[in-house]
Amino acid sequence: MAKSRCCGSQSRSRCCRPRQRCRRRRRRSCRARRRAMRCCRRRYRLRCRRY
């Protein structure tokens, strides 16, 4: 289930890699996961908000 969340979540390389899945999986996950995601906090900081 961690893989189907926003941008991966626990995986470091998977967190800032599958941004296309983020857009199709769930939009609320990204917002809540944005805080849990450290690698996504910088690169997907604005993008996570859109997904």
Swiss-Prot record:
GO terms for molecular function: DNA binding. Its main location: nucleus. Keywords: Chromosome, Developmental protein, Differentiation, DNA condensation, DNA-binding, Nucleosome core, Nucleus, Spermatogenesis. GO terms for cellular component: nucleosome; nucleus. Testis. GO terms for biological process: chromosome condensation; sperm DNA condensation. InterPro entries: Protamine_P1. Pfam families: Protamine_P1. Coiled coil: none annotated. It is found in: Nucleus; Chromosome. The keyword Manganese does not apply. Protamines substitute for histones in the chromatin of sperm during the haploid phase of spermatogenesis. They compact sperm DNA into a highly condensed, stable and inactive complex. Belongs to the protamine P1 family. This is Sperm protamine P1. It comes from Nasalis larvatus (Proboscis monkey).
